[in-house]
């Protein structure tokens, strides 16, 4: 018999939450974007094609790969304290990211960090007006591609100089892997955002709980409703679309112990919509529980130094897995240009030399699945259908019965892993797209 636990990297606390409210009809849907139309996308694709063939600086390498990511975000946020609104805002914006590679697939500027100039990385971002015309979109695409190209040239020069000085351990490993064009242009409809007025009413009602509780110094209740649409277009012919929808609540309370130590406790839950969140009665109970917990911590005696075993359970067990296991499941090589110690700040997983070795108890197996939306009745918000390089996400069995089967990787290959499994996330400057855990499922056999 197996027990299965799901760890969501984006919001790990969600995975151990009590069962969410019963599923109901999704309500009104968001519909297709009005800001990013097919005409806007066509204009950007034309500019990519033009830049690929015509963008040149005399004596410099031309671009061999250009990728653009359009991101449209709609978000409603509200924060309340002691029954009064302290923040309430609706936001709507569109950004255009350009990624330029110069050289070729064998040796380009990517996965290299220039010391003390980490943001010179062949990437550039500009905001696109909400009511942009195709002409405006094409001009913004030209400007952002030009900026990324100039950075890519600086990056490749520094990378070549570093390699000439012997600053790489694997000069034969390709910089970037080829991918067949992927086309998925159908609109992905998700439930529309909740009304910010409705979220504000809930936040004010729940935040009133902390009125009159003397030991609580500060308290906040925040709700968010978030919609993200993404489009990927590149010079290889990929044209893909994905949409993500998240709603969440967080309750925070602080106090001060008698010895002056600042104390804080919080409660958070996330889902695809507000219908996945606990109801008001449950949130009111959780707020009261936070106040009681804070008082107990405030009055607790100071613990002496302790050396010995520690048992983590519930949310603590999730955080241990999230912080000690999940970051090491990426197979993307550390970026060149820095010492191993410095490069660690940009992330770093297990070496692919460990594939095939035992890394966990034989009772445990680990699978990462960005395409999962639910685990039982619990909403999972850490996934995606398309990764940050426009590659379709894949379910990957990472560990089976304690043995490492593979690692999570994007288009930057390692010594043994040469094909992306759709897990690339842009997690650091330096043009570094790393294979990253998303919805991590851990299954255990009875021992």
Identify the residue ranges that each predicted region occupies.
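Short amphipathic alpha-helical "recognition" segments used for binding
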Residues: 6-7, 51
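Positively charged n-region of N-terminal signal peptides that target proteins for export
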Residues: 1-4
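Short, catalytically relevant binding-site loops at active-site mouths
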Residues: 373, 412-415, 446-447
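Extended C-terminal subregions enriched in glycine
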Residues: 352-357, 426-447
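Bacterial N-terminal signal peptides
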Residues: 7-17
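Active-site bordering "gate/hinge" segments
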Residues: 18-386, 391-395, 400-403, 416, ...
């Amino acid at each position: 018999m197996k027990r299965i636990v799901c760890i969501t990297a984006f919001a790990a606390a969600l995975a151990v939450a009590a069962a969410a409210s019963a599923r109901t009809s999704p309500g009104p849907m968001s519909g297709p974007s009005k800001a990013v139309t097919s005409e806007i996308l066509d204009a950007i694709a034309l500019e990519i094609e033009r830049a690929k063939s015509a963008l040149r600086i005399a004596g410099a390498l031309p671009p061999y790969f250009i990728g653009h990511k359009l991101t449209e975000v709609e978000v409603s946020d509200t924060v309340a304290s002691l029954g009064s609104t302290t923040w309430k805002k609706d936001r709507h914006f569109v950004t255009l990211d350009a990624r330029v590679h110069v050289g070729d697939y064998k040796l380009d500027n990517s996965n290299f960090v220039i010391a003390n100039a980490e943001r010179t990385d062949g990437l550039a971002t500009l905001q696109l007006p909400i009511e942009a015309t195709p002409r405006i979109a094409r001009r913004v695409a030209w400007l952002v591609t030009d900026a990324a190209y100039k950075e890519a040239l600086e990056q490749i020069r520094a990378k070549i100089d570093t390699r000439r000085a012997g600053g790489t351990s694997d000069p034969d490993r390709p910089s970037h892997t080829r991918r067949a064009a992927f086309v998925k242009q159908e609109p992905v409809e998700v439930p529309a955002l909740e009304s910010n007025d409705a979220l504000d009413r809930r936040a004010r009602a729940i935040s009133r709980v902390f009125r009159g509780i003397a030991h609580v110094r500060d308290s906040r209740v925040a709700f968010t409703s978030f919609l993200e649409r993404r489009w990927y277009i590149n010079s290889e012919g990929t044209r893909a679309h994905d949409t993500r929808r998240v709603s969440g609540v967080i309750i925070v309370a602080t106090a001060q112990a008698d010895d002056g130590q600042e104390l804080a406790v919080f409660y958070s839950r996330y889902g695809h919509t507000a219908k996945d969140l606990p109801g008001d009665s449950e949130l009111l109970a959780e707020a009261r529980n936070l106040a009681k917990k804070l008082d107990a911590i405030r009055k607790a005696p100071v613990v002496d130094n302790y050396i010995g075993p520690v048992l983590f359970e519930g949310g603590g067990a999730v955080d241990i897995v999230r912080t000690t296991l999940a970051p090491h499941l990426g197979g993307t090589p550390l970026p060149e240009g820095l010492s191993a110690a410095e490069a660690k700040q940009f992330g770093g997983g297990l070496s692919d030399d460990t594939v095939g070795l035992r890394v966990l108890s034989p009772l445990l197996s680990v699978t990462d699945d960005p395409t999962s939306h639910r685990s039982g009745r619990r909403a999972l918000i850490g996934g995606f259908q398309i990764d940050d390089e426009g590659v379709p996400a894949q379910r990957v069995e990472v560990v089976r019965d304690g043995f490492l089967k593979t690692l999570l990787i994007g288009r930057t290959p390692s010594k043994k892993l040469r094909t992306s499994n759709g897990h690339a996330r842009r997690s650091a400057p330096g043009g570094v797209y790393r294979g990253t855990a998303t919805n991590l499922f851990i299954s255990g056999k009875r021992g």
